[in-house]
Amino acid sequence: MDGLDNTTRLLAPSSLLPDNLTLSPNASSTSASTLSPLPVTSSPSPGLSLAPTPSIGFSPDLTPTPEPTSSSLAGGVAGQDSSTFPRPWIPHEPPFWDTPLNHGLNVFVGAALCITMLGLGCTVDVNHFGAHVRRPVGALLAALCQFGFLPLLAFLLALAFKLDEVAAVAVLLCGCCPGGNLSNLMSLLVDGDMNLSIIMTISSTLLALVLMPLCLWIYSRAWINTPLVQLLPLGAVTLTLCSTLIPIGLGVFIRYKYNRVADYIVKVSLCSLLVTLVVLFIMTGTMLGPELLASIPAAVYVVAIFMPLAGYASGYGLATLFHLPPNCKRTVCLETGSQNVQLCTAILKLAFPPRFIGSMYMFPLLYALFQSAEAGVFVLIYKMYGSEILHKREALDEDDDTDISYKKLKEEELADTSYGTVGTDDLVLMETTQTSL
């Protein structure tokens, strides 16, 4: 009776194992014919098809990617190469994104981002905020790059590197996301226009309600067959918008009413963000491990490195083409290359079951890592050379004869006041003449 129970438990369907997976003969004493692969449900056309419930059907020539973990990547399934098809984890072992540690880390990061956005809201100048609203050239340029250039670039990169359907969808989702909070912090570090940066972040998140599903519908037909409505990330985008608008609005109010308190909040928010970044990198490395990172194809790493660079370059190029001021150029550049990876991760978790998304759940984190590193290099270059170049240009402008500077105006005022005045020698001579008379 105990043996029958063990066999029943072994053959019971598990939500963590792919349906078409053939277990190795040494997995149990049951014969291999009992564990033969089940027929795969075919979709109308090759690729993924999303149903109203979170189930995905693959065409016969496609195989879902099992979820790898650090403990399950040591070997492969029988008859499969371990580097291309890692062995699934134990059914009782949860995936790393469902562990209590990851949930606690998400809460910690969310609270730190709210504090950061509160501090960035305290940097907004209400007097200059309206000027960007009346003339939204920078915001329009950022939106053009965000929802025009980057989705097309992600689509072309997925085709050029011949990514599989799951990896291509992850890359495309990241390319269609709106701007993230990283751009606001980096704009502050490079002396950018904070009013423009916050306007671009808010406007891109609002536009994502319409343009993000549209871009996904246009570019994802090669891999996904699904109605447009099922890809609308309204809940995730609305939550992102609220977590951005509410702290920023409160920070603007504090700056308007309590100027000294706003300065203190800015310092505290920057310190908390630095601590958050350190903790985030340490905990992410602890949860993932080198084995999981090694399971990601090299082409995905190349895409994660190249996409932020292309976004930064396109934003700066468009801002230069429209003759924006230097601080606005840096702001548009950083806003275009920085994506909201938290939103991309949330959509991947909601739209795809864990057994199909597999290691491609890591792509938004890879993109966040490389976009932060590249933006950090940009900040270091600006701090080392940008300030000196700007000071030299200001000195050259003061020495230019065609420039009417404060120094020249001051010299002219001194010359005008000395014209027609009476010197000391002349005054003594006049007094002597009057005495003699």
UniProtKB/Swiss-Prot annotation:
GO MF, one example: bile acid:sodium symporter activity
Keyword Transmembrane in record: yes
Subcellular location: Cell membrane
Disulfide bonds: none
Tissue: Mainly expressed in the central nervous system cholinergic neurons. Expressed (at protein level) in motor regions of the spinal cord and rhombencephalon, in mesopontine cholinergic neurons, the medial habenula, cholinergic areas of the forebrain, and the gut myenteric plexus.
GO-annotated cellular components: cholinergic synapse; dopaminergic synapse; plasma membrane; serotonergic synapse; synaptic vesicle membrane
One annotated GO biological process: response to xenobiotic stimulus
Keyword Membrane listed: yes
Region (Disordered): 16-84
Residue positions the entry lists as glycosylated: N6, N20, N26, N181, N195
All ranges on the Extracellular side of the membrane: 1-103, 162-197, 255-267, 313-360
Free-text description of this protein's post-translational modifications in UniProt: Activated following N-terminal proteolytic cleavage by thrombin and/or proteases.
Biased composition (Low complexity): 21-50
Site (Cleavage) location in chain: R87, P88
InterPro entries according to UniProt: BilAc:Na_symport/Acr3, Bilac:Na_transpt, Na+/solute_symporter_sf
Primary location class: membrane
Annotated TM spans: 104-124, 141-161, 198-218, 234-254, 268-288, 292-312, 361-381
Domain of life: Eukaryota
Gene3D superfamilies: 1.20.1530.20
Topology, Cytoplasmic side: 125-140, 219-233, 289-291, 382-437
Membrane topology: Multi-pass membrane protein
Role of this protein: Transporter for bile acids.
Family: Belongs to the bile acid:sodium symporter (BASS) (TC 2.A.28) family.
Protein name (Swiss-Prot/TrEMBL): Sodium/bile acid cotransporter 4
Gene that encodes the chain: Slc10a4
